[in-house]
Amino acid sequence: IFFFCLMASLYSQARPISYPEGFTLMSHSDIYKDSVYFHYSPSFKYSVGLEIAKDDYFDDEYSFFRFTYLLNRKNTQNSQSNLYFQLGLDPENFDRHFYGLHGDWETRRWFVGFGYKESFNDIEDFSEKYLQFGIAPYLGKYGDLHTWLMIKTKKNSLGDSWSTYPVIKFFKGDFLIELGYNNKTRTDAHLMYRF
């Protein structure tokens, strides 16, 4: 059970850190930007990588060197929690950078996650925050297709209010897909593949 809980938690979020010496390719798309992020994890404690983004809000394209560090992980017999620090720096414009925290707690059945990020650029600084709650409608075995039904609420300070919407997440093996939608924020999509 402990091993499955550990594996489930590794896949429940688009993982900012992979297995030691592992690689991860992630893609994210929402109303503000589309991005692709590739990272390498020298250890389970941190990852380094490159994100390439097409910013729809500022009509710009840029990249970030990224660093993510696992501040805390707590495993119990029935749950796991993680807290991460993240940092990004544009190599062509040091005024464009970000930092933030995100974390999660989960069992095989329940999930709670949060994130907060401060972003800086030449045009307008902004913050992003979210809360996410989920339930697994069934408990699969290791290697099965797993499903999370979730509610996500998020706010970008460039917008005017919180947006809350349903999200469905599937993962199997080293592949994860997460899709959410509402008429305010449109599509919120995450893809991940680890190798």
State what each model feature region is.
Residues 159-161:
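Active-site-adjacent loop/helix micro-motif of nuclease/hydrolase catalytic cores
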